[in-house]
Amino acid sequence: MIIGRDKEQRELHEAYESEYSEFAVVYGRRRVGKTFLVRETFNYTFTFEHSGVAKGNMRVQLRAFRDSLADAGMGKVKVPEDWMEAFSLLRQLIRQSKERKKVVFIDEIPWMDTPRSNFVSAIEYFWNNFASARKDVLLIICGSATSWIINKVLKNHGGLHNRVTYRLPVMPFTLYECEQYMKSRKIQASHYDLLEYYMVFGGVPFYWSLLTRGQSVAQNVDRLIFAEDGKLRYEFNELYDSLFHNPEKYVRIVMELGEKGSGMTRDELVKQCGLEENGRTSRMLEDLEECGFIRKIPTYG
């Protein structure tokens, strides 16, 4: 059962019903329910589904891709030598499919782009020379490494420039959606309790899924965050590591803003965090904003 996400589901259904091939990008911070959203929307049924391997090298990624092709009915094939060959096999699978719309779901795609793999060039070629030339392919890519999605796909200046037809940022739940989620799990909580939970966990569905019925707010928080074996004890560092390459400066920005409490101007942030006034800093701030960690408020006067 999906709580909220009405707009995202509507757009995915619209892409599926389109008379043309469509390219959808689903992205957002870790634990926010991106994969669950896509799988639930399509009832866990895809022409091809694959997920990148965390910290796997190119050979590991290609072997996993081969295995996903086999799971999709490709039959026994050798491990591709490179990504061009891998996507050539995917083209064969799509040609063989009798489905009206061929839904291709590639999850955790940033992990597949290993050094010197030419992965982005291969997926550019797959889309531009094959999928977009047909009318029956829905390509959905998904990832938590938002900076990769933004810079390598959404702001691509090469073969993927302006190719994405559906851009779906998945944001944390609102307070109302968190209340609906708690009701769906039959966990009773007063409005005050909900507010306390929201101040601790934000609107991240995975965190709320760990709450135990019958425990108080303090008991749940202590068990999940402060206990030695707490499931969220090390979540802070793991979260930034999963989202950003070289996350230290991202963490510094968020920590400085958190300590200030009332917000900071860009110039204040640059000075306080020891950043350089350049495009790299702009990209970091944009990445954090896209992930929902910070919010830019224009000043007037």
Predicted regions and their residues:
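Phosphate-binding site recognition
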Residues: 1-301
